[in-house]
Protein backbone atom coordinates (compact mmCIF):
# COMPACT_ATOMS: atom_id res chain seq x y z
CA UNK A 1 0.00 0.00 0.00
CA UNK A 2 2.82 2.40 0.85
CA UNK A 3 4.57 1.69 -2.44
CA UNK A 4 1.41 2.48 -4.38
CA UNK A 5 1.11 5.86 -2.61
CA UNK A 6 4.79 6.74 -2.84
CA UNK A 7 5.08 6.21 -6.61
CA UNK A 8 2.66 9.05 -7.55
CA UNK A 9 4.32 11.35 -5.03
CA UNK A 10 7.71 10.50 -6.52
CA UNK A 11 6.37 11.19 -10.02
CA UNK A 12 5.02 14.61 -8.97
CA UNK A 13 8.31 15.56 -7.29
CA UNK A 14 10.29 14.42 -10.33
CA UNK A 15 8.05 16.47 -12.63
CA UNK A 16 8.54 19.56 -10.45
CA UNK A 17 12.31 19.13 -10.46
CA UNK A 18 12.52 18.59 -14.21
CA UNK A 19 10.28 21.56 -14.89
CA UNK A 20 13.05 23.94 -13.85
CA UNK A 21 12.82 27.32 -12.20
CA UNK A 22 9.79 29.51 -12.65
CA UNK A 23 10.24 32.52 -14.95
CA UNK A 24 10.32 34.83 -11.93
CA UNK A 25 13.20 32.81 -10.47
CA UNK A 26 15.25 32.74 -13.68
CA UNK A 27 18.31 34.97 -13.92
CA UNK A 28 17.28 38.16 -15.77
CA UNK A 29 20.89 38.98 -16.61
CA UNK A 30 21.73 35.77 -18.46
CA UNK A 31 22.60 37.68 -21.63
CA UNK A 32 25.05 39.90 -19.77
CA UNK A 33 26.70 36.87 -18.20
CA UNK A 34 26.99 35.24 -21.63
CA UNK A 35 28.55 38.41 -23.04
CA UNK A 36 31.20 38.44 -20.31
CA UNK A 37 32.44 34.91 -21.12
CA UNK A 38 34.93 35.95 -23.87
CA UNK A 39 36.48 38.56 -21.59
CA UNK A 40 36.83 36.06 -18.77
CA UNK A 41 38.37 33.50 -21.12
CA UNK A 42 40.86 36.07 -22.40
CA UNK A 43 41.79 37.04 -18.84
CA UNK A 44 42.18 33.37 -17.90
CA UNK A 45 44.37 32.74 -20.94
CA UNK A 46 46.65 35.68 -20.19
CA UNK A 47 46.96 34.60 -16.56
CA UNK A 48 47.88 31.06 -17.55
CA UNK A 49 50.36 32.37 -20.13
CA UNK A 50 52.02 34.62 -17.56
CA UNK A 51 52.32 31.81 -15.02
CA UNK A 52 53.67 29.42 -17.66
CA UNK A 53 56.30 31.92 -18.82
CA UNK A 54 57.35 32.53 -15.22
CA UNK A 55 57.69 28.79 -14.61
CA UNK A 56 59.74 28.30 -17.79
CA UNK A 57 62.04 31.20 -16.87
CA UNK A 58 62.48 29.75 -13.39
CA UNK A 59 63.40 26.36 -14.85
CA UNK A 60 65.85 27.92 -17.32
CA UNK A 61 67.59 29.88 -14.57
CA UNK A 62 67.69 27.04 -12.06
CA UNK A 63 70.96 25.45 -11.03
CA UNK A 64 69.67 21.97 -11.87
CA UNK A 65 69.02 22.81 -15.52
CA UNK A 66 72.45 24.43 -15.83
CA UNK A 67 74.18 21.39 -14.34
CA UNK A 68 72.18 19.05 -16.56
CA UNK A 69 73.03 21.04 -19.67
CA UNK A 70 76.73 21.06 -18.75
CA UNK A 71 76.66 17.32 -18.08
CA UNK A 72 75.07 16.60 -21.48
CA UNK A 73 77.56 18.89 -23.22
CA UNK A 74 80.50 17.14 -21.57
CA UNK A 75 79.05 13.73 -22.39
CA UNK A 76 78.53 14.75 -26.02
CA UNK A 77 82.12 15.98 -26.32
CA UNK A 78 83.44 12.75 -24.79
CA UNK A 79 81.43 10.63 -27.21
CA UNK A 80 82.52 12.83 -30.11
CA UNK A 81 86.19 12.47 -29.12
CA UNK A 82 85.77 8.72 -28.75
CA UNK A 83 84.35 8.48 -32.29
CA UNK A 84 87.12 10.66 -33.70
CA UNK A 85 89.83 8.52 -32.13
CA UNK A 86 88.16 5.27 -33.10
CA UNK A 87 87.36 6.09 -36.74
Curated annotation (Swiss-Prot):
Gene behind this protein: APOC1
Signal sequence, renumbered to the chain: 1-26
Keyword Transport among UniProt keywords: yes
Gene Ontology BP annotations: lipid transport; lipoprotein metabolic process; negative regulation of cholesterol transport; negative regulation of lipid catabolic process; negative regulation of very-low-density lipoprotein particle clearance; triglyceride metabolic process; very-low-density lipoprotein particle clearance
Family statement drawn from the similarity comment of this UniProt entry: Belongs to the apolipoprotein C1 family.
Keyword Signal found: yes
GO MF annotation list: fatty acid binding; phospholipase inhibitor activity
InterPro entries xrefs: ApoC-1_sf, ApoC-I
Database matches in Pfam families: ApoC-I
Protein name in UniProt: Apolipoprotein C-I
Keywords, sorted A to Z: Lipid transport, Secreted, Signal, Transport, VLDL
Gene Ontology cellular-component terms listed: high-density lipoprotein particle; very-low-density lipoprotein particle
Location(s), subcellular: Secreted
Classification via PANTHER family: APOLIPOPROTEIN C-I
Disulphide bridges: none
Protein species of origin: Pteropus vampyrus (Large flying fox)
Function: Inhibitor of lipoprotein binding to the low density lipoprotein (LDL) receptor, LDL receptor-related protein, and very low density lipoprotein (VLDL) receptor. Associates with high density lipoproteins (HDL) and the triacylglycerol-rich lipoproteins in the plasma and makes up about 10% of the protein of the VLDL and 2% of that of HDL. Appears to interfere directly with fatty acid uptake and is also the major plasma inhibitor of cholesteryl ester transfer protein (CETP). Binds free fatty acids and reduces their intracellular esterification.
Amino acid sequence: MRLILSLPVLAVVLAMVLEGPAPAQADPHISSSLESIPGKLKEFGSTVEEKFRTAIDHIKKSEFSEKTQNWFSELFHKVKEKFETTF
